[in-house]
Amino acid sequence: MNNYPTALFLMGPTASGKTDLAIKLALQCDCEIISVDSALIYKGMDIGTAKPSNHELQQVPHALVDIIDPLESYSAGDFREDALSLMQEITDRGHTPLLVGGTMLYYKALVDGLSPLPSANPKVRAQIEKEALENGWQALHDKLEQIDPVSAARIHVNDPQRLARALEVFRISGKSLTELTKVKSDPIPYNIKQFAIAPLEKSVLHARIEQRFELMLESGFEQEVRKLYQRGDLHLDLPSMRCVGYRQMWEYLQGTMDYEEMRFRGIVATRQLAKRQMTWLRGWQNVTWLETGHADNFERIKAML
């Protein structure tokens, strides 16, 4: 057995009850929270991301919340670097890092490390986009299928950002995205205890998602997105504006759908996010499952510390 310090992962789909449980652990078990959520990183995006309240954040600080403007980008690599640094600081204080959230790509980057992918090259990307303009994205998808059939099967023709990135990686490095992503980093120096929380029944999760979206609408979500919309420098191609709920509300403000359709699509998009998160989690190794709202969840995690 190694002498590595313990770190806790509290994973789960959106609206599963992670935050309440995490705050209780932080208050009673000398844990410090690191957010693992690609939406909570953005300033000014509070209601639609179900960000912990100001009172909760004052009571229990969450690292990696409100760290960038919605115009800025933040990668899984940025997360890994920040999280490892924070985990070291927390263990140096004699506390336990508690990583909480549902962005499974961030967890994967932290645990498995990052592949040695080349940095973005504006000239190469511009050439790819020029080809797309001339020949269409389908033609570029066909090219990807020839050089990297595994990535082509995974990346949809209507996902130009990922499609362009896969082609860019090949043109810069001469190696496919699939080939490069097989290279892994060394394991991180922690004994990781992994928990996932979710309702037993999918219908319960769906009901929680709908209730939470309704509460967001009642709490001023439209006004929050309108403020972002009126800035004039944000658009739907940004990762921040592709967050569930924000895209639908943005399109409503543009006049491309009515209020009821926005509400319906926002709930559906959130359910689809939860489904993707559950798919990740079902394939995750060494996870202890907790049922949302169960009385002994706190004690089960505490017993592992």
Curated annotation (Swiss-Prot):
One of its GO terms (molecular function) is tRNA dimethylallyltransferase activity. GO terms for biological process: tRNA modification. Keywords: ATP-binding, Magnesium, Nucleotide-binding, Transferase, tRNA processing. It is an enzyme of class 2 (transferase). It comes from the Bacteria. Residues 37-40, 161-165, 242-247 are annotated as: Interaction with substrate tRNA. Substrate binds at T14, A15, S16, G17, K18, T19. ATP binds at G12, P13, T14, A15, S16, G17, K18, T19. Its EC number is 2.5.1.75. The record marks T103, R125 as: Interaction with substrate tRNA. It catalyses: adenosine(37) in tRNA + dimethylallyl diphosphate = N(6)-dimethylallyladenosine(37) in tRNA + diphosphate. Its cofactor is Mg(2+). The keyword Disulfide bond does not apply. Catalyzes the transfer of a dimethylallyl group onto the adenine at position 37 in tRNAs that read codons beginning with uridine, leading to the formation of N6-(dimethylallyl)adenosine (i(6)A). Monomer. Belongs to the IPP transferase family. This is tRNA dimethylallyltransferase.
